[in-house]
Structure formats: structure tokens, C-alpha cells
């Protein structure tokens, strides 16, 4: 309920006087949609962030993003650490679950490390962007500083909101803007436990957990494959990469691939991309980021777990072994459950939006997967959706942020223990 409460407060804040730019008005649905997008760190926008909101409105959005990025339970744990200096057992367990931690004895150290690393990464990205905006583009100090801070938080939170009306299209060939943003998105999508372990054991890969190994391997592999494919497909598209010089095309491909991993920024017009690129982006967005991260999707680890299960089955192996360790049988069921629920969460809203709007399947599916994976990329149809469709997408964003398995677990409330077994039988599959 923490996310729902934060969204409600954010909606009320965005409806207050002084939040909307002069000459513009904010409806309840647009305020609700924007607050949901910010708290869930999605980045889909029904109004232009740069021109619709005043400085106070933009500040409210980025604060909601920071709160959502850290997680409501994590923020509550942080308050307990800094103020009360004590945590209840229930809070420890809940926060440990949010972090996907193996235990909870070191939770307070973990919370401090996560918050410290978050602020450090955001500060480094903000400093790099600030210097670039100030020196190269000649922006005044106030504008450069505010844009740098906003963009850095938006990047690490995998939000994708920007204070430019064309998002990052004006910086498509500037590596000193694109690469810091990519770094922030990648680090934010790795997952807090992975960041902490990499920070502590970066020089000792043999100490890495299976989760860290999966995330590092999967992130690199998906970035390379996604970049290569999108660059190849869009290379001669005059409306996207075709107008750029070769180095800028490679940079644009890497940027696009990174942002489909729940980043949300765009340096080219997504509506002008080819159908093959849309489909590839759908797949990358659906896979998403890492567990216990600010990103969404089924998670990179889930995708790789299913991949290794498939390999083991093809080889006829009874156990699934990954990086020298045997995969738990319970993880098999969890991975399959996550994917099946996620498919349902995508298919049902897609069918509903096709009834509520006149947009083609390709655009609607892209928008729904973007909402579910909390990516925030859009083909440009979100502002033109009817209020009913915006509410549907808002619900999808919330479900995507909470997580399919977490939602299912919350409905069941507790694990059922069955004290008997039925006879075993093998149906024909495939």
C-alpha cells in the first residue's frame, strides 16, 4: 500500500496551484497518471514535462521519483535507521524482502550502503552533465544545474523524464551526455544487492553470488545484442540513424538498447523507427532490468534462469547448474510463474486498449509493455489516449513496479503446506 499512498499524495500535490505552467490546466487523470509514472519510475507522460509543469511541479515529480526509486519500504527503513536507530523485526523482514536479501542481520548496513551509493552515482552523473551543459552548450548555471540534477536522478531511477521537449534527441551525437545517462540507467537497473556486491568485491569475481553473475553476464549480453541489432536495422533509416555519421549511429544504437532496459530516454523519434526495431524493443523491455532494482520487466535473472533450464532439458540433465552452483527447484516454479503472470498482465490490457482506442496493435503493445516494464518509452500515443486508457496504463505501471510474483504472494498471504501427495503422472507435452 506504500506505493498507492505515495501516488495519492503525488496526485494531490500536482493538482495544487503553482504546479502547472501559466495558460495550462491539469486534469485529475493527468495528475494521477504523472504521479503513478513518477512513483513507479516508469516515465510515460501524458503531458510534456518540460512545458506543462512549473519548477515546483518538476521538483515534486523528481522527489516522487527518488522516493519510488528507493522503494517505500526502504525509505521507511532508512527513517528508522537515522531517527529511531532501531528497526522492528517486521520492518527488517519486509525490507529484506524488498532487497531480495538472503538474511536481515546486516540490513541496516545494506540500507546505508544503498542510499550512499545511490546519492554518489547520481552526484557523479549530475556533475558530468552539469559541466557539459555549462561549458559546451553555454547554459547559465541555474539551468545547467537543475537539468543535470533532474536528468541524473531520472537516469538512475530508470525514469526517462527529461526537461527538454524532445527528450534527448538534441544530444543524439553527444557522447558526453549520452554515456553518463547510460551509465546511470545501467547501474540503476542492476539491482541494489548487485551494486553493493560489485562495490565490495569488484576485484574478486569468484566471490560473486549467482544473482550477481547472472546480472552482469545478462546485462552485457543484452546490451551488446540489442545495440548491434538496433544499429543494423536503423542504420540507413533517414528518419532515425540514417542522418547521423557512423560513430553517432553506433552511439545512438547503444543508447537505444540501454534505454529499452527500462531507461526511458530517447535520442531519436521512436515513432519513426522500423517495425523490426519496435519488436526488438518490446522483447528487451519485457525482459527488463534486475531484481530489487528500480527497473521492471520479468527481470534479467528470470530470463536467464529459463534459458539455462531450457539448456539443461535439451542436454538431458536432471539438475540446472549455473556458474558452478545448482539452481534451486523452487526457482524453476517462480520463474515460470513470473513469466506467465507477466504475459497475462501484458495481454489483457493490450486487448482492452485495442477496444478503447483506434491505434494499431504495434503501438498499443509497445505502450503496454513499456508501462508493465516501467520503461517509459513511447511511440507518441500516450498523450492522445482517452482517460479510460490512461487509467488502464496507470494500473499496469503499478503492477509492473510491485512485481507479478509479489502481487500474487500478497493475494495468497501465506504459503500453504500440503501434508499429502497425489500419485505422480506425466502428461504428454510438446
Predicted regions and their residues:
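Membrane-proximal intracellular helices of multi-pass ion channels
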Residues: 1-430
Amino acid at each position: 500500500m506504500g506505493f498507492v499512498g505515495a501516488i495519492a499524495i503525488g496526485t494531490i500535490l500536482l493538482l495544487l496551484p503553482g504546479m502547472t505552467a501559466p495558460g495550462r490546466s491539469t486534469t485529475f487523470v493527468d495528475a494521477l497518471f504523472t504521479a503513478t509514472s513518477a512513483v513507479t519510475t516508469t516515465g510515460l507522460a501524458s503531458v510534456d514535462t518540460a512545458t506543462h509543469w512549473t519548477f515546483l511541479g518538476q521538483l515534486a515529480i523528481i522527489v516522487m521519483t527518488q522516493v519510488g526509486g528507493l522503494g517505500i519500504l526502504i525509505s521507511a527503513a532508512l527513517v528508522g535507521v537515522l531517527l529511531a536507530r532501531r528497526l522492528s523485526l517486521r520492518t527488517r523482514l519486509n525490507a529484506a524482502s524488498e532487497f531480495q536479501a538472503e538474511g536481515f542481520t546486516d540490513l541496516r548496513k545494506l540500507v546505508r550502503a544503498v542510499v550512499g551509493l545511490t546519492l554518489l552515482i547520481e552526484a557523479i552523473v549530475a556533475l558530468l552533465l552539469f559541466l557539459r551543459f555549462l561549458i559546451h552548450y553555454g547554459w547559465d548555471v541555474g539551468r545547467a544545474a537543475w537539468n543535470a540534477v533532474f536528468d541524473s536522478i531520472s537516469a538512475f531511477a530508470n525514469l526517462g523524464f527529461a526537461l527538454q521537449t524532445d527528450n534527448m534527441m538534441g544530444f543524439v551525437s553527444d557522447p558526453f551526455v549520452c554515456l553518463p545517462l547510460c551509465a546511470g540507467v545501467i547501474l540503476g537497473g542492476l539491482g541494489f544487492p548487485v551494486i553493493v556486491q560489485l562495490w565490495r568485491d569488484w576485484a574478486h569475481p569468484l566471490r560473486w553470488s549467482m544473482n550477481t553473475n547472472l546480472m552482469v553476464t545478462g546485462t552485457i549480453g543484452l546490451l551488446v545484442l540489442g545495440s548491434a541489432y538496433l544499429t543494423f536495422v536503423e542504420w540507413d533509416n533517414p528518419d532515425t540513424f540514417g542522418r547521423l555519421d557512423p560513430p553517432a549511429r553506433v552511439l545512438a544504437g547503444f543508447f537505444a538498447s540501454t534505454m529499452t532496459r527500462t531507461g526511458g530516454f530517447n535520442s531519436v523519434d521512436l515513432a519513426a523507427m522500423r517495425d523490426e526495431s519496435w519488436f526488438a524493443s518490446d522483447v528487451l523491455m519485457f525482459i527488463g532490468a534486475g531484481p530489487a532494482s528500480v527497473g521492471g520487466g520479468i527481470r534479467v535473472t528470470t530470463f536467464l534462469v529459463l534459458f539455462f533450464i531450457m539448456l539443461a532439458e535439451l542436454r538431458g540433465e536432471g539438475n540446472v547448474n549455473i556458474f558452478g552452483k545448482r539452481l534451486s527447484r523452487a526457482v524453476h516454479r517462480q520463474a515460470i510463474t513470473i513469466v506467465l503472470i507477466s504475459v497475462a498482465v501484458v495481454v489483457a490490457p493490450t486487448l482492452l486498449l485495442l477496444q478503447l482506442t483506434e491505434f494499431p496493435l504495434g503501438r498499443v503493445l509497445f505502450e503496454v509493455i513499456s508501462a508493465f516494464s516501467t520503461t517509459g518509452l513511447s511511440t507518441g500515443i500516450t498523450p492522445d489516449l482517452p482517460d479510460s486508457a490512461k487509467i488502464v496504463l496507470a494500473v499496469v505501471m503499478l503492477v509492473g513496479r510491485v512485481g507479478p510474483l509479489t502481487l500474487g504472494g500478497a493475494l495468497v498471504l501465506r504459503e500453504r503446506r500440503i501434508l499429502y501427495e497425489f500419485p505422480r503422472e506425466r502428461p504428454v507435452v510438446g
